[in-house]
């Protein structure tokens, strides 16, 4: 039985992911966040464990990793945190890591949309290039998800993925679609997602900027 630790479990993608995993799998879930007990609404206490913690609190992080098979990190923004997470995984022998980050960290967003994207989030991209490098230099079976601009739509779970070295595929993707992809990665037993950095977008959204801007 697989146990998944969700770091940043109060985040929007995380909350969609939890409901998807409860519905589509029998995995046990550890939900780690600041003030988690106040912010997270547990629907299945037999499968969900809530952990109040901070990524920089090495002790709580290490305890949370016990008996975990996979880790999902909802936000790859903070370099010291990402380093601590990798160390805690190594200390506990946890191999599978999935991390959500922004598009543009591999200079893969081309054309007018690429220029717009850089003008909007250049400092975010610069910061997240560093966290991605830490993950890629680790010995983890990582899947880095470079996400298009996000929106919410329960009825729209369409996504497509591009590999490292391919131009990014579109401007936007729903958080629900991202949760569906993460669930597919966690359920996969072939290893095809290991040590991959994937661009994620909704098909047929190749615009100059997201449709909601």
Please describe what each predicted stretch is.
Residues 41-43, 63, 109-111, 155-157, ...:
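Short, well-ordered secondary-structure micro-motifs
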Residues 77-162:
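Glycine-/Pro-rich loop/turn segments that contact NAD(P) or position catalytic residues
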Residues 4-5, 16, 31, 36-92, ...:
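NAD(P)H-binding glycine-rich loop region in Rossmannoid oxidoreductase-like domains
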Residues 3, 27-30, 95-96, 141:
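Residues at the starts of beta-strands that form the adenosine-phosphate
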Residues 2-24:
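N-terminal Rossmann NAD(P)H-binding glycine-rich loop of SDR-like oxidoreductase domains
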Residues 10, 35, 103:
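Residues in the short beta-alpha loop(s) of Rossmann-like NAD(P)-binding domains
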Residues 7-12, 153, 159-213:
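Active-site-lining helix/loop region of Rossmann-like oxidoreductase modules
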Residues 24-29, 193:
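A generic structural motif
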């Amino acid at each position: 039985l697989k146990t998944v630790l969700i770091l940043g479990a109060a985040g929007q993608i995380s909350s969609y992911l939890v409901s998807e995993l409860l519905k589509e799998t029998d995995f046990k879930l550890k939900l780690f966040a600041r003030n988690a007990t106040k912010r997270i609404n547990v629907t299945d206490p037999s499968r969900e464990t809530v952990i109040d913690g901070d990524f920089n609190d090495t002790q709580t992080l290490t305890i949370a990793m016990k008996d975990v098979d996979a880790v999902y990190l909802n936000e790859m923004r903070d370099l010291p945190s990402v380093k601590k997470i990798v160390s805690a995984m190594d200390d506990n022998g946890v191999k599978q890591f999935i991390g959500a980050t922004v598009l543009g960290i591999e200079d893969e967003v081309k054309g007018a949309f690429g220029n717009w994207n850089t003008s909007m989030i250049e400092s975010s991209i610069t910061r997240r290039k560093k966290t991605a490098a830490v993950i890629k230099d680790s010995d983890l079976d990582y899947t880095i998800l470079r996400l298009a601009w996000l929106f919410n739509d329960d009825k729209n779970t369409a996504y497509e993925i591009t590999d490292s070295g391919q131009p990014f595929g579109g401007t936007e993707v729903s958080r629900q679609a991202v949760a569906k992809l993460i669930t597919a990665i966690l359920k996969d037993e072939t290893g095809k997602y290991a040590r991959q950095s994937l661009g994620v977008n909704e098909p047929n959204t190749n615009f100059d900027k997201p449709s909601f801007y």
